[in-house]
């Protein structure tokens, strides 16, 4: 398995682990009714969470090659592999168009 795929799986696990804490801290920080000192403490707690537990660090990658660009979300396969599999007839219902 490629290192990029392993790294992405690790980030996904961290995101899943800290998702509820992160959402709670963000909601409380944006609440204007709370004391400013409490909001500052919550901001510090949010900053202490692992950086890789953030959702923006998770990258959609191809499950076959690990490619990070032009990955179709509905099947998690890159456009290059999708085309290869479609040409081989391994994807049902997908035919090359001709007119």
Curated annotation (Swiss-Prot):
Cell compartment(s), UniProt: Mitochondrion
Keyword NADP found: no
GO cellular component terms, A-Z: mitochondrion; small ribosomal subunit
GO molecular function: structural constituent of ribosome
Keyword Ribosomal protein among UniProt keywords: yes
Record key words, sorted: Mitochondrion, Ribonucleoprotein, Ribosomal protein
GO process terms (BP): translation
Main location: mitochondrion
Membrane-crossing segments per the record: none
Coiled coil (UniProt feature): none
Protein name (Swiss-Prot/TrEMBL): Small ribosomal subunit protein uS14m
Species of provenance: Prototheca wickerhamii
């Amino acid at each position: 398995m490629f290192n990029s795929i392993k790294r992405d799986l690790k980030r996904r696990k961290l995101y899943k682990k800290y998702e509820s804490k992160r959402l709670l801290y963000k909601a409380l920080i944006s609440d204007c009714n709370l004391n400013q000192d409490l909001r500052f403490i919550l901001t510090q707690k949010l900053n202490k969470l692992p950086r890789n537990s953030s959702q923006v660090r998770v990258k959609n990658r191809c499950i076959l090659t690990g490619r990070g660009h032009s990955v179709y979300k509905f099947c998690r396969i890159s456009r290059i592999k999708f085309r290869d599999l479609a040409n081989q007839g391994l994807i049902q219902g997908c035919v090359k168009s001709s007119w």
